[in-house]
């Protein structure tokens, strides 16, 4: 994996180019990973995604917690000359990164042991050791994979829990650094330590002590427990820790921060020097019946961050979900129709919502890259912060409780998981 910086600005972060493998496409950073569940982009078939969302190669974010049951099948697939991990899930031509936890769902706390990390899957809790993890990575053969780490920390974690997370991560990574040569994939060094600057420094020091070429980038973990918790983070606590960490890292390696961070938080993190994020925020919005409507184009109109499709007020609103949007959903359908699909539990409902939300979020990142190139990120941040209003907009996502009836729900919309 090769990473080159095009420009760095004190006010707008940095613009870069990322080439994950030789012969692969050059990707502009700040970059958006496409979050998947069980190897698929939620609710979207490969044909729908590639026909109506993006015709360009993307980086797919696979998670072990939703794909661990595929290990044996992937071993046979790759040994038989299969077309890689992306090809196995029906998305050939796209790059991929393998992570441990699903950023879309709240990760349960506890279950930590000295030599294993708990992996919460559909079948319950599995025990994951460093040895087992590397065996699974060898079976998956991803383009990039994160190092195994104890990320069971958040803002409320005690110092003892934070220190244990750092110590256990160092132990996991000691084995992984020794055996990484057996896997032809790029390793990301995990940086853990909760909201403790001393612990974060210790984690960074351990990574930077490794021989040159041991890893290709950094992944920050342990700020939240995934799912909707990432949308409610206190940035006044988060940003100083990120700034503290970034100052200690070399500039020629990408920095990844997974989680459903809000658009405003993402802009502030980009200014701090973070390069790669994921689309779990768009999924969380779709799961909770919200269409993203925040504006990132300068105009004189006041905007709102979401359209709640459960709202009875839109049942006779025959305008597009977002009038300026060019996605399939907004070009072909109306707010009233989305509300009707919600009320009738139709599978098409979440499909159309996800098409719009992913399209809108990808366009947002296009605008981010243009703003960074022009050193105009502060202006974009101000627009996203207030949406041309007088007060700061709230981008946090609350679990939607207006489910009609769990007993009668079909395979479309599902009850939102907290």
Swiss-Prot record:
Compartments annotated for it: namely: Cytoplasm
Instruction: Give the cofactors, semicolon-separated.
Output: Zn(2+)
Q: GO terms for molecular function, please?
A: metal ion binding; tRNA-guanosine(34) queuine transglycosylase activity
Quote the record's binding site residues for Zn(2+).
325, 327, 330, 356
InterPro entries in the cross-refs: QTRTD1 (IPR028592), Queuine_tRNA-ribosyltrfase (IPR050852), TGT-like_sf (IPR036511), tRNA_ribo_trans-like (IPR002616)
| Cross-referenced Pfam families | TGT (PF01702)
Q: What is one GO biological process annotated to this record?
A: tRNA-guanine transglycosylation
Signal peptide range in chain numbering: none
Q: Which UniProt keywords apply?
A: Cytoplasm, Metal-binding, tRNA processing, Zinc
Question: Gene3D superfamilies from the xrefs?
Answer: Queuine tRNA-ribosyltransferase-like (3.20.20.105)
Is Metal-binding set as a keyword in this record? yes
Description of how the protein assembles with itself and partners: Heterodimer of a catalytic subunit and an accessory subunit.
What's this protein's family per the entry?
Belongs to the queuine tRNA-ribosyltransferase family. QTRT2 subfamily.
Q: What does this protein do?
A: Non-catalytic subunit of the queuine tRNA-ribosyltransferase (TGT) that catalyzes the base-exchange of a guanine (G) residue with queuine (Q) at position 34 (anticodon wobble position) in tRNAs with GU(N) anticodons (tRNA-Asp, -Asn, -His and -Tyr), resulting in the hypermodified nucleoside queuosine (7-(((4,5-cis-dihydroxy-2-cyclopenten-1-yl)amino)methyl)-7-deazaguanosine).
Q: What is the protein's given name?
A: Queuine tRNA-ribosyltransferase accessory subunit 2
Its lineage reads:
Eukaryota, Metazoa, Ecdysozoa, Arthropoda, Hexapoda
């Amino acid at each position: 994996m090769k990473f080159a910086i095009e420009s760095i600005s004190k006010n707008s972060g940095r613009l870069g180019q990322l080439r994950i493998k030789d012969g692969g496409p050059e990707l502009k950073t700040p970059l958006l990973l496409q979050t998947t569940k069980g190897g698929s982009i939620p609710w979207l078939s490969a044909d729908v995604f590639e026909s109506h969302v993006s015709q360009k190669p993307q980086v797919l974010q696979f998670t072990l917690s939703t794909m661990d049951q595929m290990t044996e099948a992937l071993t046979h697939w790759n040994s038989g000359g299969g077309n890689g991990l992306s090809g196995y899930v029906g998305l050939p031509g796209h790059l991929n990164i393998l992570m441990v936890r699903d950023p879309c769902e709240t990760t349960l706390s506890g279950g930590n042991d000295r030599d294993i990390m708990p992996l919460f899957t559909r079948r319950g809790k599995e025990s994951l050791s460093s040895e087992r993890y590397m065996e699974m990575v060898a079976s998956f053969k991803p383009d990039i994979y994160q190092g195994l780490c104890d990320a069971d920390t958040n803002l409320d974690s005690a110092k003892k829990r934070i220190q244990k997370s750092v110590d256990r991560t160092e132990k996991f990574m000691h084995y992984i650094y020794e055996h990484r040569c057996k896997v032809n994939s790029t390793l990301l060094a995990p940086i853990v330590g909760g909201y403790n600057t001393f612990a974060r420094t210790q984690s960074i020091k351990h990574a930077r002590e490794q021989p040159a070429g041991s890893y290709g980038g950094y992944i920050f973990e342990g700020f939240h427990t995934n799912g909707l918790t990432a949308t409610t983070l206190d940035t006044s606590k988060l940003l100083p820790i990120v700034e503290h960490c970034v100052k200690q890292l070399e500039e020629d390696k990408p920095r990844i921060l997974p989680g459903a961070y809000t658009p405003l938080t993402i802009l502030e993190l980009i200014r701090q020097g973070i390069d790669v994020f994921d689309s779990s925020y768009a999924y969380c919005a779709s799961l909770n019946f919200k269409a993203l409507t925040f504006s990132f184009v300068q105009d004189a109109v006041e905007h709102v961050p979401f359209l709640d499709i459960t709202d009875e007020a839109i049942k006779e609103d025959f305008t597009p979900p977002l009038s300026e949007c060019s996605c399939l959903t907004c070009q072909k359908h109306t707010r009233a129709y989305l509300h009707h699909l919600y009320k009738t539990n139709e599978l098409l409902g979440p499909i159309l919502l996800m098409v719009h939300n992913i399209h809108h979020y990808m366009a947002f990142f296009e605008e981010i890259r243009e703003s960074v190139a022009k050193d105009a990120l502060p202006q974009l941040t101000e627009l996203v912060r207030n949406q041309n209003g007088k007060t700061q907009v709230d981008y946090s996502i609350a679990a939607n409780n207006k489910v009609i009836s769990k007993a009668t729900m079909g395979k479309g919309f599902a009850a939102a998981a907290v």
